[in-house]
Regions:
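A compositional/biophysical signature of low hydrophobicity enriched in polar/charged and small residues
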Residues: 1-370
Length: 370
């Protein structure tokens, strides 16, 4: 029996017609490419000059390679309003079982919803993990959640309130170049705490600027001014004011495989009630922990971890988590491909998920051998 008193389902593999593959750039990703990507995780709007200093290469080379990574869709930088900046919101962790073969179709519908901040296909007892952010009161919660539950292909739906977010970061790639890296990095790589931005900080001109930056977070102030029909200094001043007030979140999305990392895992860590905060504070110090929040369910912490290999993930679980005082146990799911993060759709997920006749999938195509 699992912790709900329910029979533990047999773990399901991905649907037979869904093959998840790594990103194929048609070329080798170099160490310089990776350094540029890690620098963009630190600050998605950093100048090519400052990125060149970190990467140890000329500005012209870094500019050319960086623009190529953006054009290829390997890196996407977007800027969105900080969670809660337009008023009170609540976040829900959603775990879904789908009818066989419908996982991708269900996930695609979730990607289309403006309430969905995060969507990923996973292994294990569930098929999909998602985060849904809903403004307003409980009546609105019911309308949104029941509406999404009606998506064709949803077989079982589990919703849990996320009570407190301890960490959201975008700089997990630092661990490639700093084996002693901790969470004490540039605050630009972190999402500001929710509800710290007064909604009065936004007017229609501010919203227009943020709307343009959503799909191209590296757009210059000059190009924004030209498109919006205002002067450059006004755009710059408004952007800096919103950023200083904690009203903006810079989202730099990079597939872990592009950085040579293969262990992306979602954990539900069960903790003694009196130890939830101390365990969360300890986990938040690890640069490999990208997201961490407390769940209403069973005194649990919901945690996303990104590490280089399965072996390093094994060490993280057995050496780090297992020895934290108060941890009772955990369940885990491997992320296969994430389709949306920070309310922004990833540009690569459709190429990673292909509909294929299972009889036509060779071992080489699947990236393995019998």
């Amino acid at each position: 029996m699992d912790q709900d008193g329910e029979g533990v389902p047999v773990p399901r593999a991905p649907a037979a017609d869904a093959l998840v593959s790594s990103i194929d750039l048609g070329r080798e990703v170099s160490d310089l490419d990776r350094r540029i990507m890690v620098a963009l995780q630190q600050d998605g709007r950093a100048s090519w000059t400052s990125i060149a200093e970190f990467a140890g290469a000329s500005v012209s080379t870094v500019t050319r390679r960086g623009q190529q990574l953006l054009a290829e869709g390997v890196v996407r930088v977007g800027i969105v309003p900080t969670l809660g900046s337009e008023g009170h919101v609540e976040s829900f962790l959603i775990r879904i079982n789908c009818t066989p073969g419908s996982q991708v179709a269900v996930a695609e519908k979730l990607v289309e919803s403006p309430y969905v901040r995060f969507v990923t296909l996973v292994t294990g007892k569930f098929d999909i993990f998602a985060e849904i952010v809903i403004p307003g009161d409980s009546a609105h919660f019911t309308r949104v959640l029941t509406g999404l539950q009606a998506i064709p292909g949803v077989e079982r739906w589990r919703s849990d309130l996320l009570m407190h977010t301890y960490k959201v970061s975008f700089d997990w790639g630092r661990q490639l170049y700093d084996s002693h890296a901790t969470a004490a990095s540039d605050p630009q790589a972190y999402m500001p705490p929710p509800n710290t931005c007064d909604p009065t900080h936004f007017d229609d001109a501010d919203r227009a600027i943020v709307a343009e930056l959503r799909d191209n977070g590296r757009a210059s102030f000059l190009s924004l001014a030209s498109k919006l029909g205002v002067n450059e200094s006004s755009v710059r001043r408004r952007y800096e004011r919103m950023r200083a007030a904690g009203c903006l979140t810079t989202v730099t999305m990079i597939p872990a495989s592009a950085l040579g990392m293969s262990a992306e895992t979602l954990l539900m860590v069960r903790v003694e009630p009196s130890r939830i905060d101390s365990v969360a504070q300890a986990l938040a110090q690890h640069v490999s922990v990208r997201f961490l929040a407390s769940s209403l369910e069973e005194n649990s912490l919901y945690c996303e971890v990104i590490l280089p290999t399965t072996e390093t993930m094994h060490d993280f679980m057995t050496v780090t988590i297992a020895h934290l005082k108060g941890v009772r146990g955990w369940s885990a799911s491997m992320e296969l491909v994430f389709m949306k993060r920070g309310f922004i759709e990833t540009p690569w997920w459709r190429s990673q998920v292909t509909t294929t006749d299972p009889a036509q999938i060779s071992w080489d195509a699947a990236g393995s051998h019998p």
